[in-house]
Amino acid sequence: MCRDEPDTMILTQIEAKEACDWLRVTGFPQYAQLYEDLLFPIDIALVKREHDFLDRDAIEALCRRLNTLNKCAVMKLEISPHRKRSEDSDEEEPCAISGKWTFQRDSKRWSRLEEFDVFSPKQDPIPGSPDNSRLQSATSRESMLTDLSEHQEVSSIRSLSSTSSSAPTHVPHSGEATTPRTNSVISVCSSSHFVGNEDSFSSLPSPKELSSFSFSMKGHEKNTKSKTRSLLKRMESLKLKGSHHSKHKAPSKLGLIISAPILQEGMDEEKLKQLNCVEISALNGNHINVPMVRKRSVSNSTQTSSSSSQSETSSAVSTPSPVTRTRSLSTCNKRVGMYLEGFDPFSQSAFNNVTEQNYKNRESYPEDTVFYIPEDHKPGTFPKALSNGSFCPSGNSSVNWRTGSFHGPGHLSLRRENSSDSPKELKRRNSSSSVSSRMSIYDNVPGSILYSSSGELADLENEDIFPELDDILYHVKGMQRIVNQWSEKFSDEGDSDSALDSVSPCPSSPKQIHLDVDHDRRTPSDLDSTGNSLNEPEEPTDIPERRDSGVGASLTRCNRHRLRWHSFQSSHRPSLNSVSLQINCQSVAQMNLLQKYSLLKLTALLEKYTPSNKHGFSWAVPKFMKRIKVPDYKDRSVFGVPLTVNVQRSGQPLPQSIQQAMRYLRNHCLDQVGLFRKSGVKSRIQALRQMNESAEDYVNYEGQSAYDVADMLKQYFRDLPEPLMTNKLSETFLQIYQYVPKDQRLQAIKAAIMLLPDENREVLQTLLYFLSHVTAAVKENQMTPTNLAVCLAPSLFHLNTLKRENSSPRVMQRKQSLGKPDQKDLNENLAATQGLAHMIAECKKLFQVPEEMSRCRNSYTEQELKPLTLEALGHLSNDQPADYRHFLQDCVDGLFKEVKEKFKGWVSYPTSEQAELSYKKVSEGPPLRLWRATIEVPAAPEEILKRLLKEQHLWDVDLLDSKVIEILDSQTEIYQYVQNSMAPHPARDYVVLRTWRTNLPRGACALLFTSVDHDRAPVAGVRVNVLLSRYLIEPCGSGKSKLTYMCRADLRGHMPEWYTKSFGHLCAAEVVKIRDSFSNQSTESKDTRSR
């Protein structure tokens, strides 16, 4: 057995590393730091008490990881310290969900705000010990880790069968010398009796059990340092032997033989009672073998409609540790390091409950519904009619609902729901195999051709599979034919060419398909919270004349025209009570905390309900934040351009022409029957694509067919380099609708949405709100959420598509049209349809802060970081008396200090704009970089300052309104301006204290402003917090000036990663627009003189 010890140690180290990574990204970084500093084991009961605001699932997910680390600490296993990120990326902002911990930025340590013993379980005084001292708790003024390093003593268990185990433990006084590095954990290092099988971790005693043991320190005559040195040498020798053995051992011809349990020497009856050992023979023949329990089916964790009470038992016995999902070991390895709360492994009732639950799950699997498809159905198209029923095997036959196969003697009955007739039985063609008629009801799904067991095509045309449907189908086809003739009469062009091979018609009746979605029947008045008409005319849109130079970046830089869609914004304006709960109103620190909580919640739900091999840690936050080389998209403007590139170019994730297409459909085409279902014309759709690529600023859709525009919109999402839900998270979205129960899907999908990148989440919100308007007109267009989902889900999830360039490994090669569709593909298509329909129906609830965040003590509300008042700004200055003028003067001095030091410490950053871009990390405040953009402008400093102060509308295309609230002096004022956002997201509201200077050395000018809280400024949108904004204008000769713009702002509703990837590009684009405003003005003046 000893030869397996190195492998076991390596696997345990991997498990500990993954547990620490999970703790960091879910808001528990303090525990990962404690483990790396060898301050484990900790008392899990006290951790539960500290996080009592979390629900049961989240607590179990946390305790599983802590229990794993406790066992690893007992085994004296260390992991490599957490590596810092590269210099060009921000370190992750320290963030803990619990409000009882604080991060000391000077020492980079976590410490507690109040005394709380978290490291050792409470225990009775040990008899014979000279002192009853316990671990001291750290306060907010000193690091807890340093405090523990000075007072905690080490104990080493060399062997559980040591003859000195009955000696009393000596707890040293606080004055006794201890070794800081080795005084952290109790280690188990048995040299000869260590069992190296895969389940050896779970047999280790817990921290509470260790407290009942007593260990001898063999007197005080032996030096502590010598003991520590010998212990480290022993550990190092074990590591060297293990690594050498793992590299050179020959493969064994015989399988690993594990003997029966061997009672160690010295294990008397008292110890057996402490370990809860039970005699197997005492079970009276009714026992259940432990290996059978470990090999049992995981069906109890995969059911999709089980109640919460039933699933609790399932999760308690079937949730593995993270590392077991990433390696392929024997089935008995699936319970390594799991946390079982209130579960007695030797309880007979526990085994009986598990067996009974598995039997119930096998007997009544909920997903036994099938859809009947007519025999003249054309593969690849939507059937004319569908009816649902269920398979009922007759006799002794059994059905495997996971794979769709069934086995048994010769007959299979098809029972129709709500049918009073006796079921008709049909003989199968072969008793050894089944032929399943599985036709897809989604576009993009190739038609399936069934094969018999011999590999030949099954002749189903001569076999009457659905005789009961003949009469019904006859009438349905006749009515469908009448509807088609009526719709063709009113269509603009009778061309039957399909624009896309994947576009297929779906039933026009809202009740014809039931895909397990609760339809939310909404009227237009329900969607419009402000009383505005959904189809109210927009303000007239003038096409501005292009004024750029026609060369360089001005040809590829987007959008001098902004779409202003006020009716769409006002129809989804939240009520006053729910404004603070909207995601787009949260600060960057709150978004960071909310993302960690969402990952915690999603992990808990997926581990509870999904099979062990269906989920993992690959979709966690650091994975999709990994920096990837992005290809160049200079030759593309709309189609095939990532959403991130759109943000960097124009400040909005959706191109203007795509937004205009959505507005055209919403204002003029909601009454078109079968919108997004009926196909457009290929030639016209191709012409629309060319119009979008050539003139992305503005595209006139007047007179275009609604079906052509809708198909073009579907093509836009299909042509994105990755799905809207991203490659990393698409599978998670599908798993939610495959395994998570209905009553918990909403909170699971809200958590998954919070893990999306900001631009993907904003586009998803815009699209879902738009589709909710389409379903509001269901009486006219007959498009329910389910019908829309059938048509759009393949495009949004990129289902059933061939692997493309730059796509992730998840997009696998799909089967060709002549092959049999894979069961996984069918399950994913069904889950995607159900998921999209559910998100359309519940779109108003998906983008709100969970109510659970209000229970995070004060850690969430404290992160709001509102702008300060004038009086509070005055207190930031060191001068007395406190006044905002002193604060402004300090800002001016800081600006010229940067100039004097020639901007030392700034890091250059690449950008596509014709400007120099750099950044500087700031340790204070929220996790936001300070960005700097520099450009040369063909104007004098005074002219540029006037353009910035009085003529913002000439260069800011997003400006909606601006006004001066209060004039404080000749060079200082309170200024408010509002910028437009992509509909239906609310506008951005700025209220700033700004001051300017013109009498600076060398003829320079400066404009400085920062956000301020002013009672006379009305709220006109989401209030932005500008922490720092500076304009420095220096003359550089020949009538030109050097414009330097520095900014650090919290725009609300964005993650720290968004500011790292996109905000700097927006700063560079702003100075380019200021320069272009002067270039265009000079060009116009020359044209006027030439005339």
From Swiss-Prot:
Keyword Phosphoprotein in annotation: yes
Domain Rho-GAP residue range list: 641-847
UniProt topology in membrane: Peripheral membrane protein
Region spans: Disordered: 120-181, 296-329, 402-439, 491-552
Annotated consequence of substituting N787V: No loss of activity
Localization per record: Cytoplasm; Cell junction, Focal adhesion; Membrane
Polar residues bias locations: 130-143, 499-511, 526-535
Sequence ranges assigned to domain START in this UniProt record: 877-1084
Site-annotated residues for Arginine finger: R677
All copies of domain SAM, residue ranges: 11-78
Spans annotated as Polybasic cluster (PBR): 614-636
UniProt function note: Functions as a GTPase-activating protein for the small GTPases RHOA, RHOB, RHOC and CDC42, terminating their downstream signaling. This induces morphological changes and detachment through cytoskeletal reorganization, playing a critical role in biological processes such as cell migration and proliferation. Also functions in vivo as an activator of the phospholipase PLCD1. Active DLC1 increases cell migration velocity but reduces directionality.
Known partners and oligomeric status: Interacts with EF1A1, facilitates EF1A1 distribution to the membrane periphery and ruffles upon growth factor stimulation and suppresses cell migration. Interacts with tensin TNS1 (via N-terminus); the interaction is decreased by phosphorylation of TNS1. Interacts with TNS3 and PTEN; in resting cells, interacts with TNS3 (via C2 tensin-type domain) but, following growth factor stimulation, TNS3 and PTEN are phosphorylated which leads to weakened interaction with TNS3 and enhanced interaction with PTEN.
Protein name: Rho GTPase-activating protein 7
Species of provenance: Rattus norvegicus
Gene that encodes the chain: Dlc1
